[in-house]
Amino acid sequence: IPEDLMQKYNFAVIAPNGENGFWLDGLSTTRKYCTFVGAELVDYVRRTFRLALSPEDTYIMGLSMGGFGALHTAFAFPDNFGKVAAMSSALIVHEIAGMKPGEDNGTANYDYYHECFGDLDSVLESDSNPEVLVKRLHDSGKKIPEILMSCGTEDFLLEHNRQFHRFLAEEGIAHTYLESSGSHDMDFWNEYTRRFIDSMFAD
């Protein structure tokens, strides 16, 4: 996070480690990354440092796997976050749905995804799918954090991000989705980190 923006807008950054677990409460493990970030860490920061005392002042941001995690966590704990920014998000639930033991997608194998997401035959209908969480909020009329997304046009995750963008649009869920030239790299993320922080703190 650029220090000049931290000083300009007077905000603190809390950066936990998700250990390549997609920031999920691993359905096949006892790891609770989503609950930790979305509830426990927020509560700890508020009690200990007296920071981000309201959801309107609490934002969550991530890139790649962290982009998936930021969206999923914001939708799982919408009362704790005012805005979510996600860049080049690894929104791969449709890609891994139905994967069988012994299979892989060139990035990881069935065992890894099963450990993170649980039953891959039912992952599309599960709470590991951000689509399920945000649609549930929308259908019930509950608050949805403001959504900001971006992806580079040369990013290998572009179609996954476009698919999620189309899903939100079809469901009538307000969001900002931006594309521009760029790959899955720090050049793109540095640009959109600045753009999104300026946008998030512009109000």
Task: Label each region the model flagged.
Residues 1-203:
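Non-catalytic cap/lid and distal C-terminal segments of serine-dependent acyl enzymes
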